[in-house]
Swiss-Prot record:
The gene coding this protein: rplA
Function: Binds directly to 23S rRNA. The L1 stalk is quite mobile in the ribosome, and is involved in E site tRNA release. Protein L1 is also a translational repressor protein, it controls the translation of the L11 operon by binding to its mRNA.
Cellular component GO terms held in the UniProt record: cytosolic large ribosomal subunit
Family per similarity comment: Belongs to the universal ribosomal protein uL1 family.
Name of the protein: Large ribosomal subunit protein uL1
Xref: SUPFAM superfamilies: Ribosomal protein L1
Assembly mode: Part of the 50S ribosomal subunit.
Keywords: Repressor, Ribonucleoprotein, Ribosomal protein, RNA-binding, rRNA-binding, Translation regulation, tRNA-binding
Transmembrane domains' residue ranges: none
Any GO molecular function: tRNA binding
CDD domains per the UniProt record, alphabetical: Ribosomal_L1
Superkingdom assignment: Bacteria
One Pfam family named in its UniProt record: Ribosomal_L1
InterPro entries for this protein: Ribosom_uL1_bac-type, Ribosomal_uL1, Ribosomal_uL1-like, Ribosomal_uL1/biogenesis, Ribosomal_uL1_3-a/b-sand, Ribosomal_uL1_CS
Length: 232
């Protein structure tokens, strides 16, 4: 298949095997952004873990300081009372218990995040086949099972991203939009990497952050020189 002018320009801009300072990497991505929509800026982080071992799987969440640029719809399972009121006050689109579960079983799943208080998991547990395949099942490891639903809703809406290692030991995550300021993208990536460092498994040996690459939705992957980031 013949390459488009854009693909040729991208190929010419990125030197295979070269790691670019973060600022240069973002400039390459922004210059290659030609889609008719605002593309996302994504990151792939190869970790020094054996993803086949359960004690080396990395999973968690990070609240990006500059947000994700996305509007997030949140549903909360919480019993009627203070916790439900707290979730509604924080901006949740839907709050309930059995009534909310029935709606979801009927196909009402227009949510990006589902949160539950611990005492609501007896209801949520029955929705495993509905929420699980969509990546919506609440989990304490990523902050979506919480005794403080208001805080969890605020985190979700202010730019919380969830991550977990894939079979190759790589974390994939969105750190913003192509129209974000460079400093905003850098602060988001730094926050994510610092949380990944905190989540390093005790049994992981050798170099932990092996490779960091950024890309746009329709653009190339560019390796980032980690020395251009402040990770302390």
């Amino acid at each position: 298949m013949a390459q488009t002018k854009r693909e040729k320009a991208i190929k010419a801009a990125v030197v295979p095997g070269k790691a670019y300072a973060f600022e240069d990497a973002i400039n390459i991505l922004k210059s290659a952004t030609k889609a008719k929509f605002v593309e996302s800026i994504d990151v792939a982080v190869r970790l020094g873990v054996d993803a086949k071992k359960s004690d080396q799987q990395v999973r968690g969440s990070t609240v990006l300081p500059a947000g994700t640029g996305k509007s997030v719809r949140v549903a909360v399972f919480a019993p009627a009372g203070a916790k439900a009121d707290e979730a509604l006050a924080a901006g949740a689109e839907a709050v309930g218990m059995d009534d909310l579960a029935e709606k979801m079983q009927a196909g009402d799943l227009n949510y990006d995040v589902v949160i539950a208080t611990p005492d609501a998991m007896r209801v949520v547990g029955k929705l495993g086949t509905v929420l699980g395949p969509r990546g919506l099942m609440p989990n304490p490891k990523v902050g979506t099972v919480s005794p403080n639903p208001g805080e969890a809703v605020k985190n979700a809406k202010s730019g919380q991203v969830r991550y977990r290692t894939d079979k190759a030991g790589i974390i994939h995550c969105t750190i913003g939009k192509a129209d974000f300021a460079e400093d905003a993208l850098k602060s988001n990536l730094t926050a994510l990497l610092l949380d990944l460092i905190k989540a390093k498994p005790a049994t992981s040996k050798g170099t932990y952050l092996q490779k960091v690459s950024v890309s746009s939705t329709m653009g190339p992957g560019v390796t980032v020189d980690q020395s251009s980031l402040t990770l302390k």
